[in-house]
Structure formats: C-alpha cells, structure tokens
C-alpha cells in the first residue's frame, strides 16, 4: 500500500453513537453534521410538531415516532479527518441491528442523560463495545437541565460499567445555573451562551483564570475548582493507551440541544479516536493496510428510495481500496461481481462514490446477491470475516396477506424485509405458512407499517405468543414430536427448529428425547 493511501486510511474515523432512547443521540448527531458543514441547521426530534425532522431519522415511521429504528450512515470531513458516523437504533427491540452496526465501527460515542445516568439499553450496548475492545467516548448530555451531580455520574459510570473514567472537562453549575465548562485538556474555560470571540477563557499555571472575569462570580465556580482539584489528586491519570484499549473512557459534559461543548468534544474526539483497525477472519488478522480490497456486509436496507424500490447493502471496507467498477468475489457463493453501482450517504441523500478506502462505509445496490455477514474481496476467494450476531426471537406472529390478489406484493415485502435482518422468518413445517419472529413488539409494528407503505400490502398478524426457539439437526426433525407446546417449524434457510411454549416444555422434551440436541442463537 502506498504512503498516500496509508495516510488516507489513517484519516478515517468510523464510529457509532449509542444511547438509551431520549438521551439526545440524534440531536448530538445533528450538531456534529452541522460542524461538518453538511447541514445548515439542526432539526431536532422535537420537530415532530414543527414538521422538521432529524437528518438521520429518514424513514417515515421514525419521523412520526421520533425514535431511530434503523441505523443511518453519515459522512463528512472535519479538521483533516474523514468522519463516518453510524447512528444506531436506540430502541431495545432493534438491538440486533445495533449489534451488527457495532461490528462495523472502530470506536463508539456513548451519550448519557445527566438526569438519568446509566440506563438499561446503554448498559447493553456498552457491553458489546467492551466485548469488541473498542474505545468508548462518553458525552454526558443535557447539562442545561437539572440532573445528577457530576461526581455522582462519574461514580455511577465507573461502578455500573466497570471502566475507568477521565473527565476531559467539568461543568461549572448546571440547569439554569450552568455558567461554563472547565476544559482540563485544552486548559481553557468555555463559557455558556457567550459570543464566539469571548467563549474561551485561558487558564493559568495554577489552574485558575489568567485574568479576572465575571464567571468567577458564579456560585458554582469555586465548587468546580475544588472538584477539579479532587479529580487531579484522587482521580484516574489520563492514559491514551488505556483509552485506545477500551479500558478508560474520556468523559465530556455538554448540551447537544443548545450546542454547548459539542464542537470541543468533536475536536478532541478526532485527536484521540483510532484509525481503522484490523479484523479477524478465517485466514487470520486482516490489517487495514493490506493492499487487497476486502469488506463485509453488516446491513441491508430496502426502499431507501421508495420511488425506485431499491435495496442497498452497506459494506464496511476492512482493507485496501475500493474503485467503482472493480470485480470482487462474493466468498459465500464464489460468484464474481462487478461493483458498478456504489453510493455514499447522508441519511436518505446519496451520491455515487468512485473510490473509498479501509474504514469507509459504502452502499452497494443489491439485486438479491447479498446477505448480512457476507464477505467480498479481490483477494483470497475463501476469505470470511467473523460472523455477525443473530438473536433468537422471543415473540412470534403468523402473518397473512389480507388481499389474496396481492400475494406477489406480500411475498416480495416479507422476503426483502427479512433479508434486512429487522425481523426473522419461519414457516410451518408442512403448509409453509409464514411465521415472523421478533425480539420486541415494536419490530412487528414497523414491519406492518412498512409492508403497507412500501409494498402496498395490507397484512393480518395473529399472535402465537412468546416462544422459545431451539434448532435441531435435520435428522432429528420428526413431525411426530410436534405438539401445541413444541411446534416444529423451519427457518428461512429450511433449517428445522421447535418453538417451545416455556422452559417446562423444553425440559419435558429433553427428558423424552435425550439424544436430540437443542441449540439457540445469541
């Protein structure tokens, strides 16, 4: 790989934003896009009433509900770096999509609501990042409102997440009393709601302001200095190595809604976030500077442009250089594919991309070639990157087309939405009626909404309740074992499994059939 190309790869910063719903993830994404010069004004999720919608919430149902249910991809340049942001679903029902997205990034930004601290979904997603060993940057949001005390938030962060923290800045007051941020890294105080030329006040060697200023009259100024002294004496030492190893999280305070502390965060993040990392494969570690092009598909999205009924496969480039028109091998099938139609994104806006390098996320127009988890490369034809996580669904519904004359629309819709991985498809053993499985109820609502809106197919869903899915070997798929409490079905790859009513039904089945091995997904 040439030095120029190595430099280009090193400039990539590819990260996901994770949080619990309503922590302000979409708002901070909007502000980052603002600083990247991509949008002129940030439309927050509050725009549900005003008709202004967030850039990353492009799907109709997301606009209506104000939650992210698909992972958007956005790209911009900032301070010599190419930023690739993946905005992940905050809702727990879509955790599988989020988990797959986290396999495609080199670091994560965790957004925490200052009033609520660590919430359930944040903890779940944090654990995945920890499992991958990627750096995690923390942004404690909504400091313009009353919330938990900063020291309390730090203690909770370290205790619940079991990670070291290092506050890069420290709030001077909060809520109505918020006066500024003491920036430990840049050695300045950033004033809240001040003119641009007066916003940053330099600090002296003693840690206080070089010159007297009004902010020192704030009730919370002395308290902030005392807390910073405490952090200097008793807190963790700053360690770039531990940050890159995912063992220490730099913590930033701010307010995404009032755009306070966000650009300072972005500037610092770009300094510290890692360049594209290596990826594990069946042929060993594939480094980003490997000259052979390779990548994996972590997401498929149908109908990003409803007028064209298209399908886009999102690929994380792991090594080498992509050039439009190049020939690659889809290693799952051994098929040679010409990558003639490729695109980069700003939510639903897109432009053709002629070249991209390791770390970039690009979209490939898909006519049905790809599956989630596929590897493509112009190198070894047997290369496969590590498998992406798939969750065992817990809720199941039979699904039918209301209008039998529109079976074609119905089957196409089910097939495409299942290929996206947002919902899982099963069929009854003999009659092959459709059963769909999901992790949570919202997935069914989104499925129904999209079938109606994107495929013109009204559907009827009949709950068959909460079930426990367990796969069996083909030779063990005996229809005589199928009962109301242990229904034999097949998945979309025609692999047999039983849907059990409860743990008792599984235990009963195991007692009666000790030689049959039951397996689950994640």
From Swiss-Prot:
CDD domains: RF3, RF3_II, RF3_III. Keywords: Cytoplasm, GTP-binding, Nucleotide-binding, Protein biosynthesis. Residues 10-277 form the tr-type G domain. It comes from the Bacteria. GTP binds at residues 19-26, 87-91, 141-144. PROSITE patterns: G_TR_1, G_TR_2. It is found in: Cytoplasm. GO terms for molecular function: GTP binding; GTPase activity; translation release factor activity, codon nonspecific; translation release factor activity, codon specific. This is Peptide chain release factor 3. The lineage of its organism: Bacteria, Bacillati, Bacillota, Bacilli, Bacillales.
């Amino acid at each position: 790989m040439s030095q120029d190309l190595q430099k280009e790869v090193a400039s990539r910063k590819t990260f996901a934003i994770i949080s619990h719903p309503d922590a302000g993830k979409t708002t901070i994404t909007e502000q980052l896009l603002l600083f990247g010069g991509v949008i002129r004004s940030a439309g927050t999720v509050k725009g549900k009433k005003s008709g202004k919608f967030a850039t990353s919430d492009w799907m109709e149902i997301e606009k209506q509900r104000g939650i992210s249910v698909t992972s958007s991809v956005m790209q911009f340049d900032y301070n010599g770096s190419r930023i690739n942001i993946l905005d992940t679903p905050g809702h727990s029902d879509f955790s599988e999509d989020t988990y797959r997205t986290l396999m495609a990034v080199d670091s994560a930004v965790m957004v925490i609501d200052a009033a609520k601290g660590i919430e359930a979904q944040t903890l779940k997603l944090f654990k995945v990042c920890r499992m991958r060993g990627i750096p995690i940057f923390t942004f404690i949001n909504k400091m313009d409102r009353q919330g938990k005390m900063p020291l309390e938030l730090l203690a909770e962060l370290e205790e619940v997440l079991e990670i070291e923290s290092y506050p890069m800045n420290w709030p001077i007051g909060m809520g109505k009393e918020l006066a500024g941020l003491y920036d430990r890294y840049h050695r300045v105080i950033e004033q809240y709601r001040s003119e641009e030329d007066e916003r940053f006040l330099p600090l002296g060697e003693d840690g206080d302001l070089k010159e007297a200023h009004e902010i020192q009259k704030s009730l919370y100024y002395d308290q902030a200095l005392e807390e910073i002294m405490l952090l200097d004496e008793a807190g963790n030492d700053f360690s770039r190595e531990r940050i890159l190893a995912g063992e220490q999280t730099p913590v930033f305070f701010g307010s995404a809604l009032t755009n306070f502390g966000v650009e300072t965060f972005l500037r610092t993040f770009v300094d510290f976030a890692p360049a594209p990392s290596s990826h594990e494969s069946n042929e060993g570690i594939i480094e980003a500077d490997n000259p052979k092009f390779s990548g994996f598909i972590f997401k498929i999205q149908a109908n990003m442009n409803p007028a064209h009924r298209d399908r886009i496969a999102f690929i994380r480039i792991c090594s080498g250089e992509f050039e439009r028109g190049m020939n690659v091998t889809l290693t799952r099938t051994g098929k040679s594919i010409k990558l003639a139609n490729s695109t980069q994104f700003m939510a639903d806006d897109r432009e053709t991309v002629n070249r991209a390098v390791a770390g970039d996320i690009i979209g490939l127009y898909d006519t049905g070639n790809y599956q989630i988890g596929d590897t493509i490369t112009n190198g070894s034809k047997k290369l496969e990157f590590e498998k992406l996580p798939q969750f065992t669904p817990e809720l199941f519904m039979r699904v039918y087309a209301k209008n039998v004359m529109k079976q074609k629309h119905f089957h196409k819709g089910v097939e495409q939405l299942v290929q996206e991985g947002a919902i899982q498809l099963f069929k009854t053993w003999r009659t092959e009626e459709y059963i769909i499985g999901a992790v949570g109820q919202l997935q069914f609502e989104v499925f129904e909404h999209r079938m109606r809106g994107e495929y013109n197919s009204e559907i009827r869903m009949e709950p068959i309740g909460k079930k426990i899915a367990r796969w069996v070997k083909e030779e063990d798929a005996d229809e005589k074992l199928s009962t109301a409490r242990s229904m034999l079905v097949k998945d979309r790859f025609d692999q047999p499994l039983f849907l059990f009513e409860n743990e008792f039904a599984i235990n009963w089945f195991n007692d009666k059939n000790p030689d049959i091995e039951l397996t689950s997904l994640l």
